[in-house]
Amino acid sequence: MVTTPNEHQFLPRSLRDLLACPDCHGALAGEQGELCCQNCGGIFPICNGIPIFLREPVAVVPAEHESNALGPEFEQILERGEGLTLHLGAGGSARRYRNCIEFEHKIFRHTDVIGDAHALPFRDEVFDRVFAFNVFEHLRNPALAAAEIRRVLKPGGRLVVHTAFLQPLHEAPHHYFNATEAGVREWFRDFAIEHCEVSGNFSPGFMLGFIAATLLEALRESGAPRADQSEVAGTTLGQWAEFWWKKNAPPPGFNALLSLAPELQKRVAAGFELRARKS
């Protein structure tokens, strides 16, 4: 399902006054059915009350879809409604918060604006804070998106980012980067970074569970014999560690994982080999 323009939709002034052309940052005029850039002439439709700043069709996610909770700390910040928050990649939030603009590339239950995080359709220095949870691994150019966030934040504005490090492939094909701490700091090097730490939802135990679940799911999808699936599930961390330390032969199930189809191996591979030629 994709959106189509609705000429009888209006934008509230509180939202319209935040918006700018994503291409040139020019002022936008009009509010019934479409917005027009007064500088470059770009035209952007309003669909069901939501300004659309993408050129391609936009999918509508069923209203009953609910994304993962933000967690008490960030929900309390939004509940207080202090200052204006931009929530990038908000997904299907459990509730709508005042003074929070939900930004997405699909239309979810509370989406306010549709666009591209690499070219935010907002004026300079209008937000007091930005939340971006589990977004940056899905961006083609994280450094550019970071620069855009910095542009739309007020001086002293706050940023909270959660992003992947050791995570299997998810939301394919738009999972581009898993970043080390050094990588995350590089993306946001123009900010005054206060800390870059492992939050509770990214602890090693969660990572281990995510990887193990992905491996077992890949075996099931491959149609591997139940004996092979059970063999892998029954191995211990100690067996794999001893193998890595080159003290023992491969654990039971090693060959079953080695025999997975290439597309299934890509979900949780240690790395990739690329071969190319100059075109």
PLM-predicted stretches and their roles:
Residues 2-125, 129-133, 252-257, 265-273, ...:
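Conserved N-terminal segment of class I S-adenosyl-L-methionine
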Residues 22, 128-131, 150, 185, ...:
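Short, surface-exposed helix/turn micro-motifs that flank interaction/cofactor sites
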Residues 42, 119, 137, 167, ...:
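Active-site micro-motifs of SAM-dependent methyltransferase domains
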Residues 94-96, 140, 169:
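Glycine/Thr-rich phosphate-binding loops of Rossmann-like dinucleotide-binding domains
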Residues 125, 140-144:
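Short N-terminal helix/helix-N-cap motif within the alpha/beta-hydrolase-1
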Residues 133-136, 162:
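Residues lining the SAM
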Residues 135-138, 201:
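Short beta->alpha junction loops/turns
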Residues 143-144, 148, 154, 158-279:
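S-adenosyl-L-methionine-dependent methyltransferase catalytic module, highlighting the catalytic core
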